């Protein structure tokens, strides 16, 4: 009677090969070859342990007997359902857990052709749909209240007001606001615009309204003087006499502050 570790059946039934490959994947391939962070490796290790726990709890396969054959298409589909229905994890979490298993199978198939059919079949197991969250927009009156929330007395308040006006006019992300430099403003162009560095390191040019141009000219005079440094951060703070660009967290706090002010 042949067992699961019988080499005549191939490596996909070999439990020793499974555990040895998993160890090399986690301890050598990920940190040394792929240069993954300790956090990522820990996440992969946890995900693989969860899958092995599923095989024991649901499929009755003892931990020491697990082999690559147990990660076939049907078991992976059942694994997804188990994570979603029994564990009640979000689709994103379920998909991340599945990705770790597929990554191990991909590595194992490169090490041994016996695992290739298992890996190929795993690629037909698609992740769960991640529902897109509905985007909620400000009403005109709400947006007007937010833009008027900063005061005029403090210098920082006047800076914050300019940030809100420009961010609203150009539909900018927080990270794009922090990345703006003086040279990104093209106020004297036939159609005034700003040059924004967006996701993927790609620039885009966005026209701005005449009223915004007027606000920016006043802001530049106050915050950057008559001869602005082109590479200076457009929006900055001063600490110990030194200018430095604002962080994303800083702008998030500004937005939260004025949003709470508008609710009162």
Q: Which residues does each predicted region cover?
A:
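Conserved catalytic core of the tyrosine transesterase superfamily
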Residues: 1-264
């Amino acid at each position: 009677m042949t067992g699961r570790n019988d080499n005549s059946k191939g490596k996909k039934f070999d439990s020793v090969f499974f555990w040895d490959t998993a160890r090399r994947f986690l301890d050598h391939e990920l940190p040394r070859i792929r240069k993954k962070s300790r956090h990522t490796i820990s996440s992969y290790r946890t995900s693989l342990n969860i899958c092995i726990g599923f095989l024991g709890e649901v499929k009755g396969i003892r931990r020491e007997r697990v082999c690559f054959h147990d990660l076939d298409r049907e078991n992976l589909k059942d694994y997804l359902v188990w994570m979603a229905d029994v564990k009640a994890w979000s689709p994103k979490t379920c998909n991340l857990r599945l990705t770790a298993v597929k990554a191990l199978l991909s590595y194992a198939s490169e090490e041994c052709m016996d695992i290739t059919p298992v890996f190929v079949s795993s690629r037909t197991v698609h992740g769960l749909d991640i529902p897109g969250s509905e985007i909620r927009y400000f009403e005109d009156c709400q947006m007007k209240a937010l833009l008027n929330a900063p005061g005029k007395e403090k210098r920082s308040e006047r800076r914050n007001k300019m940030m809100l006006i420009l961010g609203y006019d150009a539909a900018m992300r927080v990270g794009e606001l922090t990345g703006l430099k003086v040279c990104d403003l093209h106020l004297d162009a036939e159609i005034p615009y700003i040059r924004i560095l967006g996701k993927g390191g790609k620039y885009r040019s966005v026209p701005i309204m005449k009223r915004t141009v007027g606000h920016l000219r006043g802001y530049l005079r106050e915050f950057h003087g008559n001869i602005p440094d082109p590479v200076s951060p457009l929006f900055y703070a001063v600490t110990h006499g030194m200018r430095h660009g604002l962080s994303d967290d800083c702008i998030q706090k500004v937005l939260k502050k004025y949003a709470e002010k508008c609710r009162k």
